[in-house]
């Protein structure tokens, strides 16, 4: 009787560990899929950074005060760079 109980508990523990590992793998794969657009967002961020600093340099060359370019979509220009607000 004790051996049967031990066998059942062991199987249950293995099943729980296997299920947990499978859930972690599934969550990890979903994060990888969601993470793919981050590279595209990084490219957009670099473009915004470039646009902001270039516009400020152009204004400085004209012997005018550097008026920071207003960035759109939750971004602002700070230290000649677009930063997320």
UniProtKB/Swiss-Prot annotation:
**Domain of life, per lineage:** Eukaryota
What intrachain disulfides are recorded?
A: 52-66, 56-77, 71-82
Q: Spell out the molecular function terms from Gene Ontology.
A: toxin activity
Prodomain positions: 23-48
Q: Where in the cell is it found?
A: Secreted
Q: In which tissues is it expressed?
A: Expressed by the venom gland.
Q: What does this protein do?
A: Neurotoxin active on both insects and mammals.
User: What name goes with this protein?
Assistant: U4-theraphotoxin-Hhn1a
* Organism, as annotated: Cyriopagopus hainanus
């Amino acid at each position: 009787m004790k051996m049967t109980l031990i066998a059942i508990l062991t199987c249950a523990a293995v099943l729980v560990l296997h299920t947990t590992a499978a859930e972690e793998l599934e969550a990890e794969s979903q994060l990888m899929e969601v993470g793919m657009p981050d590279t595209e967002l990084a490219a957009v961020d670099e473009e915004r950074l470039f646009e902001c600093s270039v516009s400020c340099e152009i204004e400085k060359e004209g012997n005018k005060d550097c008026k920071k370019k207003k960035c759109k979509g939750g971004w602002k220009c700070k230290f000649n760079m677009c930063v997320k607000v």
